């Protein structure tokens, strides 16, 4: 989660693709305020509401410059959780790894988990949310290492 919201799905250890690459960042999610979003195609899709550029547009500052206690983070956690609820409902994943520039704000993880738990409302049993929703084990190098891994396979 940074300049956009990209999602990869692995099934049986292999990337899942259909007729074209997944565009989960462009799913529509409920928005509780008047912010129109920044996506040039959909405006208020998940990426248009919760990506780095949307944070800057909504709050007038880059995410990295906002204090950890800024109200933006509660809104961001809510928006990210809404997208994750759709992913959980549709894919029943074993793991959701959230990385990128926006997710370098570590205070987001417990906030997102709390929002997911509240929104899921015990609909079905979920694994421990701290195990389900996690940060990349490879830190900021995960994107490049994953790309190299895909190319080499």
Q: Which positions does each model-derived feature cover?
A:
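ATP-binding/phosphotransfer module of carbohydrate and carboxylate kinases, centering on a glycine-rich
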Residues: 15, 31-153
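A short acidic/small-residue loop/turn micro-motif
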Residues: 22-25
């Amino acid at each position: 989660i940074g300049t956009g919201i990209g999602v990869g799905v692995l099934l049986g250890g292999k990337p899942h693709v259909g007729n074209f690459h997944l565009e989960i960042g462009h799913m529509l999610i409920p928005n509780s305020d008047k912010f129109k979003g920044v996506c040039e195609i959909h405006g208020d899709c998940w990426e248009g509401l919760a990506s780095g550029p949307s944070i800057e547009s909504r709050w007038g500052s880059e995410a990295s410059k906002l204090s950890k206690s800024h109200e933006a983070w509660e809104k961001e956690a809510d928006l990210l959780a809404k997208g994750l609820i759709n992913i959980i409902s549709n894919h029943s994943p074993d793991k959701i790894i959230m990385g990128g520039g926006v997710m370098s704000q570590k205070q987001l993880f417990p906030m997102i988990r709390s929002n997911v738990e509240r929104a899921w409302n015990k609909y079905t049993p979920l694994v421990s949310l701290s195990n389900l929703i996690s940060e990349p084990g490879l830190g900021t190098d995960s994107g490049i290492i994953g790309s190299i891994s895909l190319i080499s396979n």
